[in-house]
């Protein structure tokens, strides 16, 4: 009987310690690697790289000191909706606000595309927008499902 009780106590302690353990892993991906993986997996037209100082021109009300790291590529021609934005913020409390900026940008592009390039609308209606800790990401590509898979694994 004592062995049974001792075994049960060990089992209960094991369950309690498993319940208290944290399964949330904090990832710290290199954004250059993430954008490289996306570019390797998905076909893009000619893309232009955007610098942090130019973010306000693209609807992101951020100062360079707000951004710890960034990768931003957009269609060089402006005729397609292809765009990938990866931002690591210095202050993660701003992440939801920056996500909203990405959604507003997507909606603005969609409004224009609806009239001029309606075939680009699917990229925008299925675009990936998300936040994970201090990271914000937005992707409108030819394969948003693949972009989402890569981004989910990265963050």
Describe the predicted segments one by one:
Residues 81-91:
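A short acidic-to-branched-hydrophobic micro-motif
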Residues 98-105, 150-155:
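Short amphipathic alpha-helices in soluble, non-transmembrane regions
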Residues 49-79, 93, 97:
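Short, compositionally biased low-complexity segments enriched in polar/charged residues
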Residues 104-127:
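An anionic, turn-rich surface loop/hairpin at beta-sheet edges
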Residues 119-155:
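A short, solvent-exposed beta-edge/loop patch
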